[in-house]
Amino acid sequence: MEQVEILRKFIQRVQAMKSPDHNGEDNFARDFMRLRRLSTKYRTEKIYPTATGEKEENVKKNRYKDILPFDHSRVKLTLKTPSQDSDYINANFIKGVYGPKAYVATQGPLANTVIDFWRMIWEYNVVIIVMACREFEMGRKKCERYWPLYGEDPITFAPFKISCEDEQARTDYFIRTLLLEFQNESRRLYQFHYVNWPDHDVPSSFDSILDMISLMRKYQEHEDVPICIHCSAGCGRTGAICAIDYTWNLLKAGKIPEEFNVFNLIQEMRTQRHSAVQTKEQYELVHRAIAQLFEKQLQLYEIHGAQKIADGVNEINTENMVSSIEPEKQDSPPPKPPRTRSCLVEGDAKEEILQPPEPHPVPPILTPSPPSAFPTVTTVWQDNDRYHPKPVLHMVSSEQHSADLNRNYSKSTELPGKNESTIEQIDKKLERNLSFEIKKVPLQEGPKSFDGNTLLNRGHAIKIKSASPCIADKISKPQELSSDLNVGDTSQNSCVDCSVTQSNKVSVTPPEESQNSDTPPRPDRLPLDEKGHVTWSFHGPENAIPIPDLSEGNSSDINYQTRKTVSLTPSPTTQVETPDLVDHDNTSPLFRTPLSFTNPLHSDDSDSDERNSDGAVTQNKTNISTASATVSAATSTESISTRKVLPMSIARHNIAGTTHSGAEKDVDVSEDSPPPLPERTPESFVLASEHNTPVRSEWSELQSQERSEQKKSEGLITSENEKCDHPAGGIHYEMCIECPPTFSDKREQISENPTEATDIGFGNRCGKPKGPRDPPSEWT
């Protein structure tokens, strides 16, 4: 058990001891009675004999006839003087932390034992004398004055001469500097005289006692020579000071035993000096004083721990500067900061060291911005989240020219004036690149086995942020993919950002150009030549997919390997073919809605390998309808994927959708037959909030808002043959999911309608707020 836990347990035990039992006595009184019974047993049964103190020649040297030194631990005097040649003095050694003779517990000198007292001081090279009583207490002589007063002439106790060189008055005690001379040799020693400790009682405050003991240990830190402690009898107050100092030395050495308790300590002391800690009040004082020492030590531990953390941060900053000069490659980060991780961005090896978190929030969504205006995805999480490292961009070269992940960002941006207010809100949320891939995940997530050569092992999620009507401009025709393609191509699952331009179209660079062109430098702009159209581009150097126009009524299948697609289209029906990916874990990747952006670093369960090593694909077609509805954000804990992926939605909920069963049609694999229409529930129209309870009472309000929005929409309108019994006006995203063609009611999906602008941010939902309240900025 660590020292901190031991100290806390002792403090709690002392606090519990103050509570009285059924007899009205607290634990202090009960424990002290046990100590007294043990001492009586020692005396009556002669367990620790006191034969030397009982001798006739030594009886007169004892201040109290019942307080005699134990023979096995008594201090023996060997220094002879002409007047005194006996070896007896009423004193005992008490062992300390480092030796058996750390303390000399003795009675206050009598008039006939002062020379014996100085003999003992000289013989055992004592430097510190602690006196815990007054010379007179309650009209009785408690101790002979064995030192001269400050400013008076030296006192001679032949053959010893004692002078007082200095005296310092402190709270409740004095510090005197004494000069001891014997046979032309002099020694300087110090007397700590505590004057406010009543006999058989305790002082009102023990802070001055602790202060005196602390200062005493500054004068003598070691135990090479004993410290002489005495009061009147050399038992009660003497034993209390010894117990406190002994425990303090243990504490400073970090050697407090796991089962430390004061009872055992004083019981052992009583086997060395008779009646050490003489009263119940003194016994309680020792507990309280030690508990206070432990509390102060705990505070020191906390301060020391904070300093260690600060030093660690400084070391991280220093190593960050060094690593920027000398980059290294490390595939596995250490479990403690500083953690390093190598990444390949545009063919350059870079080492990145996680920095301590900054106070500003993580920007949620990417918007067009000039270079260096805001941090990109490679720096956002590095600067803002120390414990959840950023996603790493990788460029994996293939036989042909590598496709740049951000090749579609190289075009200039033009913003329409009518959407300036919306874009300002988007700009406030900073930027985050939508096209990225994760190759590495921090060790703290505990991911499963990764194959870093050819396989993309994370389920990718997307965010869309736009301010004008968006539709899918083109969807590629089916193109068979060879089973030996490089599945690890970095262009997989990359998506083209949705943005706003003057016209209602977005021109996407054809994927054929990405194959034939060299890898351009990473741009900072989005492709915004035309207005409103959204295209999810799944292109790569070897598996580029042509995108035909769906607005002309040509619905086609997307045949791809390890791809996840989202179609935004005005067509009545959109048929997307999703392959059944063959993998060992039988996991099903799915698309998250814009409100449920899946942070790969926040997934509770690690994603497994999504495909075979040979890249074999078993295809299965699934009809996906495009219905007109609002972006659903109903909270639900159900997930349709066999692979558990918990999205890190900013609303902190998963988005659940339901399908409409009333207008179902037979699912057909052909491209001409319309798919079944999804059924919407009131819960799916409620915005995700910090509460799990859906607001059903606002269903009618949402219906009226959506109908008014449908009338105002200028863009494309869904065909009349769409059987939708729910109001239109939202954007419904259909997720391509590895599953049988039929959709269950528990399947997550989001309806799409291109009649509204594709503004799916938290601040702007289809151009106007659709929720019961404005979402707070803390979501981002």
Swiss-Prot record:
Pfam families: Y_phosphatase. It catalyses: O-phospho-L-tyrosyl-[protein] + H2O = L-tyrosyl-[protein] + phosphate. The modification N-acetylmethionine is found at M1. The keyword Manganese does not apply. Disulfide bonds: none annotated. GO terms for cellular component: cell projection; cytoplasm; cytosol; focal adhesion; nucleoplasm; nucleus; podosome. Residues 622-639 have a biased composition (Low complexity). Changing Q278A: Nearly abolishes enzyme activity. Substrate binds at residues 36, 63-67, 199, 231-237, 278. The modification Phosphothreonine is found at T509, T519, T569, T598, T693. Residues 345-438 are annotated as: Interaction with TGFB1I1. One of its GO terms (biological process) is regulation of epidermal growth factor receptor signaling pathway. It is found in: Cytoplasm; Cell junction, Focal adhesion; Cell projection, Podosome. The keyword Hydrolase applies. GO terms for molecular function: non-membrane spanning protein tyrosine phosphatase activity; phosphoprotein phosphatase activity; protein tyrosine phosphatase activity; SH3 domain binding. Residues 502-519, 552-577, 587-601, 690-703 have a biased composition (Polar residues). Belongs to the protein-tyrosine phosphatase family. Non-receptor class 4 subfamily. Dephosphorylates a range of proteins, and thereby regulates cellular signaling cascades. Dephosphorylates cellular tyrosine kinases, such as ERBB2 and PTK2B/PYK2, and thereby regulates signaling via ERBB2 and PTK2B/PYK2. Selectively dephosphorylates ERBB2 phosphorylated at 'Tyr-1112', 'Tyr-1196', and/or 'Tyr-1248'. This is Tyrosine-protein phosphatase non-receptor type 12. The lineage of its organism: Eukaryota, Metazoa, Chordata, Craniata, Vertebrata. The gene is PTPN12.
